[in-house]
Amino acid sequence: MRAVVVLSLASFASAAALRAVDPLLPLLAEAFGTTAGGASAVITAFAVAYGFLQVVNGPLGDRIGKYRMVFWVTAISALGNLACAFAPSLPLLVAARFATGATVGAIVPLAMAWIGDAVPYERRQPVLARFLIGHMLGIALSTTVSGGLGERYGWRAIFFVLCALYVLTAALLWFELQTNPATRQAQAAREPVTQSFLRMAGLARGAWVRVILATVFIEGMLFYGALAFAAYHAHRYLGLGVGASGALIAAFAGGGLVYASVAGRLVPRLGERGLVLGGGSFIGLGYLGLALAPGAAFAIPCLAALGMGMYMLHNTLQVHATQMAPESRGAAVALFAFCLFSGQSAGVWLASNAVDTAGTRPVFIVAAIGLPLLALDFRRRLAAHRLTLAHG
């Protein structure tokens, strides 16, 4: 479906903005006379806005149309990245990143919600996995290009590139809205924003919804709190330059792409519980290996394992998120994203303090222990949920 391909490009742009700053932390710290932990405020601010503005973006998407909302936030995000490129100080860069995160944050959740409206549940997980190919490529290319551009032209260069990318993506989304009836028809009935807010607040009363939201919050805190410092770890402890350390993170996206390419066969073979168990195992091994890696060559398969494991676990959570409230799917998936990026914000803040005092390895080890335990707990709860549904 062409509409999904364009949404995948929007997801690419979203991921590019999300992860492009990671390899630039050493350059930002040097440019603004601060530590890597201090420079990581640009990551935290983006994640905070990305998460907290979901409570607005989701209901608006339900009201005005999810695909149309993705177009508008993509167009506005181009201006946000331009503001980042011209920021004269770290506080203003943090403010510009916060503003950009507020709009970029709506892209993936509303795109997922639109897919939830358009694709039946039994076919949804492979479609979501293919949609996320754009997201994974965005991570891979943004960290690689950002690091290389940063070394050659300075940290501002990547934001000009991102601005151009968002302009192009917005143009393609607008074309789809004008020419593809599916972008206007495949959505739940539009309801008042206030009703969508009330429905979002009421979701937390469901026991299974609370499990999904709590799990994704902890996942975001442990996984992305540690991943934000993977490029810095490669630069500081593995002896790589800024460009090479950014390119190294592409291995993470490579692992995710492997999952996306085999998801159609893997999902029916392993089932949801098998995906969760395998995902937790890959993540634990990946972070433990990264903490102990003696060199970059050893770190590459560790990052690939992280990508494979993360998308096995997270894709399962995403599918359940699209079913939390089918009648108000934009608000429901936005609440899911709110919890994910609230967790990431907390994780990056906690990790930044640990990195400045104890280095990156303790952060990776905590993630290596905590995430497999989280996966085991969710697997157990998933089995109990299936039994509850089976017995009515």
Describe these PLM feature segments.
Residues 53-65, 259-271, 355-356:
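Helix-to-loop junctions at the C-terminal end of transmembrane segments
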Residues 178-212:
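Juxtamembrane intracellular "pre-TM" segments in multi-pass secondary transporters
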Residues 92, 120-126, 130-177:
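Helix-loop-helix hairpin linking two adjacent transmembrane segments in secondary transporters
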